[in-house]
């Protein structure tokens, strides 16, 4: 299907650069941006152009993973993001520094970013307090509760639960679609990769080993006699801790902050997004999206490869 979508565009536009509308003068000296998605075809491209009311210049079309990517130039408006919702593709203005060919640093949130679940919610279900903990998690991710306070509250509900339920959750840990391909590709190009998570070491350290990541920071359950005590051991990894982790890794690896990426879905990821050269909100909460540099609503984690490959083409 992706090949058909790709060819529907290249058959109409066999040479670049060219105007989307052949009979009208294109926008001159526009800003570069990309549209991308697994179902991006000529119909979606034309519908987007009609909504925008501009004759964009199209400079390139290529594929990364299963994504079709179109490089355009035009007069940028923030409304473009709303228009892409209607055609179910993603968009990104190319006003950031990181590129695939230049090694940098990626720091990821874990729950609902690197993996498809919120681990503490799954643990709570097995401990019989699922609904209570899920409600607190949602409120915290929306930024309605102080993260540290909400975390200690959620962990407190798990007091007395057997340590074995952590293993049950880890055995069925669903990786986010596109995670493995994205990490392996970045590592191939010399990128450093890390997790900074408000989740727990039992899962973050597992992912670090599985994916051969360079670093992982997360919270630690306090466990005594094979049971959770309901306490968090040591400092809580909150928004500021995540931001400091990213800064520390930049210094340790000698990487310019302009060549770093932070990606996450919750309010507690915004601080590290602001430190990074590129902050990406991934299928994020409504409060988070307007504050992020790039928003991904439809693509999987290979969206990062789309963004980085685009910067290599401008």
UniProtKB/Swiss-Prot annotation:
Residues reported to bind substrate: 118, 154, 197-198, 242, 268
Catalytic activity, EC: 3.1.3.3
Pathway, per record: Amino-acid biosynthesis; L-serine biosynthesis; L-serine from 3-phospho-D-glycerate: step 3/3
Active site, per annotation: 109 (nucleophile), 111 (proton donor)
Keyword Transit peptide: no
Binding residues for Mg(2+): 109, 111, 265
Catalytic reaction(s) noted: O-phospho-L-serine + H2O = L-serine + phosphate; O-phospho-D-serine + H2O = D-serine + phosphate
Function: Catalyzes the dephosphorylation of phosphoserine (P-Ser).
Name by which UniProt lists this protein: Phosphoserine phosphatase
Organism of this sequence: Haemophilus influenzae (strain ATCC 51907 / DSM 11121 / KW20 / Rd)
